[in-house]
């Protein structure tokens, strides 16, 4: 059994920045976004279903799926977004389970952006939230994705509200600036804390693999 810490947060909150810092100190990271991308690229059955559903408007010239175009498409159509999540999510969970089974360390970081939206928080022992003020999320989205403020607000509106994420989380990192030194201190502290929790001899503290 392994102690699973789920890392989550809203769009452009800095989840990748934090998970990369954990990687640098040797923590095993399972990122569901990365798993999802690979499924779309390599699972022919799923990729064919996506192409059939959305057509040429989400394809590159080589007939591969353009994730940016796909994302724009689903965020403008709620039913399409839910359809895509429903065909990807079971496969993502299955792949996550396989990867976690291979880990030999005492704890691992499971990065799940839609942890609360998909109501799977109980599959983790502890929840680490990367929290960012909405105004900063919007600013980062506009810069990263080249979208306007109304589009950014619409995307955020589809996610669980900030207050609810905070209330459901165990540990919180407030990420509103680029203070890497302070972030590194948090990462080292949390690593030691999670090692401590993982070594407690209470079976209830452990997950048998998601």
Curated annotation (Swiss-Prot):
Official protein name in the record: Dephospho-CoA kinase
Any GO BP annotation: coenzyme A biosynthetic process
Gene: coaE
Residues of the signal peptide: none
Subcellular location: Cytoplasm
Originating species: Buchnera aphidicola subsp. Schizaphis graminum (strain Sg)
GO cellular component annotations of the record: cytoplasm
Keywords from the UniProt entry: ATP-binding, Coenzyme A biosynthesis, Cytoplasm, Kinase, Nucleotide-binding, Transferase
Pfam families named in the record: CoaE (PF01121)
Biological function: Catalyzes the phosphorylation of the 3'-hydroxyl group of dephosphocoenzyme A to form coenzyme A.
Listed Gene3D superfamilies: P-loop containing nucleotide triphosphate hydrolases (3.40.50.300)
Primary location recorded for the protein, binned into one broad class: cytoplasm
Family of the protein in this entry: Belongs to the CoaE family.
EC number: 2.7.1.24
Coiled-coil regions listed: none
Pathway the protein contributes to: Cofactor biosynthesis; coenzyme A biosynthesis; CoA from (R)-pantothenate: step 5/5
Domain DPCK: 4-201
CDD domains for this protein: DPCK (cd02022)
HAMAP family to which the protein is assigned, alphabetical: Dephospho_CoA_kinase (MF_00376)
Gene Ontology molecular function: ATP binding; dephospho-CoA kinase activity
Residues given in the record as ATP binding sites: 12-17
Catalytic activity: 3'-dephospho-CoA + ATP = ADP + CoA + H(+)
InterPro entries: Depp_CoAkinase, P-loop_NTPase
